[in-house]
């Protein structure tokens, strides 16, 4: 069961993109900044970008058909455009957020990070931006995030600070009210349990080897 997170000031009139559409947009934003020579992206390159194991929270495994369906939906919403370069039979895709939502620079970079890595603090966004955008400081991040929140419908929202958190986090609103999955906590627990089981199995194997060696010495 998903539980809605509380937004500072509320989260009304949000967008309604599914997880695949959000990931496709985030990947296009990132690659436009990081690999401009290879942008726009082919479907194959886009799938690879969506399924990266680094800088992705959560890691996803989209198939070509998943990405293609997401592209079709985004094209219908005028958020993505398909291009067929002269002399090429392979279509390429680019986002149109700067046209449709009138955002660029710091605001695009902040939205990119939120779509790819989920809720984050302003400091985390600045630290993770890397070559996507060089924020001058946390204040510039906050300015960009507030500009996204002031759009209509809003593109981002500041979450209420949770117990144990030093700073409030920000989230995108491209999929409606922000949701949290309790299963995520279970996955973390499962990873820890798997590690302990593996360590115990290795210890048992080592003990068996010692017993076998001792038996061989006694029988010899």
UniProtKB/Swiss-Prot annotation:
Species in which this protein is naturally found: Chromobacterium violaceum (strain ATCC 12472 / DSM 30191 / JCM 1249 / CCUG 213 / NBRC 12614 / NCIMB 9131 / NCTC 9757 / MK)
The cross-references to Gene3D superfamilies, in alphabetical order and at most eight, read: Winged helix-like DNA-binding domain superfamily/Winged helix DNA-binding domain
What is the protein name stated in its UniProt record? UPF0502 protein CV_4303
Q: Which InterPro entries match?
A: DUF480, WH-like_DNA-bd_sf, WH_DNA-bd_sf
Q: Which PANTHER family match?
A: UPF0502 PROTEIN YCEH
- Give one Pfam family: DUF480
Domain of life according to the entry: Bacteria
Q: Which family does the entry's similarity section mention?
A: Belongs to the UPF0502 family.
